From Swiss-Prot:
Gene Ontology BP term (one): regulation of cell shape
GO cellular component annotations of the record: cytoplasm
Coiled coil: none
Enzyme Commission number(s): 6.3.2.9
Main location (coarse class): cytoplasm
Native source organism of the sequence: Chlamydia felis (strain Fe/C-56) (Chlamydophila felis)
High-level lineage: Bacteria, Pseudomonadati, Chlamydiota, Chlamydiia, Chlamydiales
Name of this protein: UDP-N-acetylmuramoylalanine--D-glutamate ligase
Length: 419
C-alpha cells in the first residue's frame, strides 16, 4: 500500500474524522489548527502545527480542507501553489472502496437539505430498506459510511468546492434550490452555484440529477407534484403542509425511486408519521392570541422569505445576527405583504435598519432576549412572533440550534403555551 503524508487543515469534528480515516489507512497525518487544544484532543495526528503559513510542512502528498475553512485561507493557497491535491471529507469518502458497497444518494441546496435527508431516510425505512443519514447533517461521512444500508448524504457547497474530477458514486442526487447564500465564503452567487452544481460530477448516470427552484440543470422533481398532491389530499395530509415542505418531500420521493419502487400509499404514510427537525418554521404554541414560531435555521434571505410566505400575515419578525453578505433589501416585497413590525437584533441590527426601516416599522435590539421582549410589547391577538433571523448565529450563539433553544426558553418563561 502506498502511504502518504497528508495535511488535515482543521481539527473540528470533520477534521478529526478525516484524521482517523487516514490514520487507519496507514497515512502519516499532519494536523493544523488555530487551537492547540483542538489538535492535542485528536490522537490520530502524527504531527501537529498551529495555523500559520510558515508552518506548512514539506513533502506533502495530499491536503484535506475541513469544509468550514475558506478556499482563500493562506495554507490552502500555499497548497495550490505547490500543486498539492486538495480534497474535503466528501471526496475522501467517495474515493474509498467502502463507500461503493451500498447505493448512495446525495442532497444539496440552499435550503431544505436536512429536512429532505431525514424524510428520505424515514421514507426508505418505511419501505423496509436500511438507510442512514450522513455528511453535513452532523454525522461525519468518513465515520458513518461503514454502516450497512443506503447512504443518504447531505452535502454543503463547502464540501463540493474542490470537486474537480468525476467520481461516479451516487445513484441519484438532488439540488433542491439555489439562492443567494454563503457569499461571505464564495464571494459571488456564480461561484456558489458552481459549487452546488459539482454534485453532478458524482453521479453514476447523468439523468439521475433532480433539481428544483433556481436550478437550470437536471430533471425537475416537481414533475411528481400532481400525483403527490393527489394522494396527500385524499389522505388529509396536504392542507397542513407548507409549500416548501411539500417540495422537499417531492425531492425525496424522486430520489427514493432511484433505488426502489415507492407506492404512493407508503409515501403518504411516511409523510403522516414524519417528525420535522426543530428550528425550521417550528410552531411553539399560542398565548393570549399570539402565536410563536421558531425558524432559527433561517440564515438566508430565501429562507426568511419562505417562512414569511408560510405564515402570511400579521407577523412581527425578529431578524439579525452575523451578516453573511446578504442583501436585506431583497426582502422588501415580501416584508411589506406580510410583516407589521421588524425587530432587528445583534451584530448587524444597524445594517438591517439602514436597509429596511424606510419601508416598515423597525425597532433595534441588542440581543435575542431584548428582541423577544420588544416583540411581545408590540404583539396583539392574532399576531405571529416569528424568529427568522436571515443571519448566522455566531455573534451571540455557537449555532442556530442554540439560538432556537434560547428563543424557545425565552418564550417558555411565560405561562405554558397553548399548543
Amino acid at each position: 500500500m502506498n502511504h502518504q503524508r497528508v495535511v488535515v487543515l482543521g481539527a473540528g469534528v470533520t477534521g478529526k474524522s478525516a484524521a482517523e480515516f487516514l490514520h487507519k489507512k496507514g497515512d502519516f497525518v499532519i494536523g493544523i489548527d488555530g487551537s492547540w487544544d483542538a489538535l492535542i484532543s485528536c490522537n490520530f495526528f502524527h504531527q501537529r502545527y498551529l495555523d500559520k503559513t510558515e508552518n506548512f510542512p514539506e513533502d506533502v502528498d495530499l491536503f484535506v480542507r475541513s469544509p468550514g475553512i475558506k478556499t482563500s485561507h493562506p495554507l490552502v493557497i500555499e497548497a495550490k501553489r505547490r500543486d498539492i491535491p486538495i480534497v474535503t471529507d466528501v471526496q475522501l469518502a467517495f474515493q474509498s472502496p467502502e463507500f461503493y458497497q451500498y447505493p448512495s444518494l446525495g442532497i444539496t441546496g440552499s435550503t431544505g437539505k436536512t429536512t429532505t435527508v431525514l424524510f428520505l431516510v424515514h421514507l426508505l425505512h418505511s419501505l423496509g430498506i436500511s438507510a442512514f443519514a450522513m455528511g453535513n447533517i452532523g454525522f461525519p461521512i468518513l465515520q458513518a459510511m461503514y454502516q450497512k444500508g443506503v447512504r443518504v448524504v447531505e452535502i454543503s457547497s463547502f464540501q463540493l468546492t474542490e470537486q474537480e474530477q468525476k467520481i461516479p458514486v451516487l445513484s441519484g442526487a438532488a439540488i433542491l434550490n439555489i439562492s443567494e447564500n454563503h457569499l461571505d465564503y464564495h464571494q459571488t452567487l456564480h461561484a456558489y452555484s458552481e459549487a452546488k452544481m459539482n454534485i453532478a460530477k458524482c453521479l453514476q448516470w447523468p439523468d439521475s440529477l433532480w433539481s428544483g427552484e433556481g436550478v437550470s440543470s437536471g430533471r425537475s422533481y416537481l414533475e411528481y407534484t400532481e400525483e403527490i398532491d393527489s394522494v396527500l389530499d385524499k389522505g388529509g395530509a396536504l392542507k397542513p403542509l407548507y409549500l416548501h415542505d411539500r417540495n422537499n418531500y417531492c425531492a425525496a420521493y424522486a430520489l427514493a425511486k432511484e433505488v426502489t419502487s415507492v407506492p404512493l400509499e407508503a409515501f403518504l404514510q411516511a409523510v403522516q408519521t414524519f417528525e420535522k427537525p426543530p428550528h425550521r418554521i417550528e410552531y411553539l404554541g399560542e398565548k393570549d392570541g399570539v402565536r410563536y414560531i421558531n425558524d432559527s435555521k433561517a440564515t438566508t434571505m430565501s429562507s426568511v422569505e419562505k417562512a414569511l410566505m408560510a405564515v402570511k400575515e400579521n407577523v412581527i419578525v425578529i431578524m439579525g445576527g452575523r451578516n453573511k453578505e446578504s442583501n436585506f433589501t431583497s426582502l422588501i416585497p415580501v416584508l411589506t405583504q406580510t410583516v407589521k413590525h421588524i425587530v432587528a437584533m445583534g451584530e448587524c441590527r444597524k445594517e438591517i435598519a439602514q436597509a429596511l426601516s424606510s419601508s416598515l416599522p423597525l425597532t433595534q435590539a441588542r440581543d435575542l432576549q431584548e428582541a423577544v421582549s420588544i416583540a411581545q410589547s408590540i404583539a396583539q391577538p392574532g399576531d405571529v412572533i416569528l424568529l427568522s433571523p436571515g443571519c448566522a448565529s455566531f455573534d451571540q450563539f455557537r449555532s442556530f440550534e442554540e439560538r432556537g433553544d434560547c428563543f424557545r426558553q425565552l418564550v417558555g418563561d411565560m405561562e405554558a403555551l397553548k399548543i
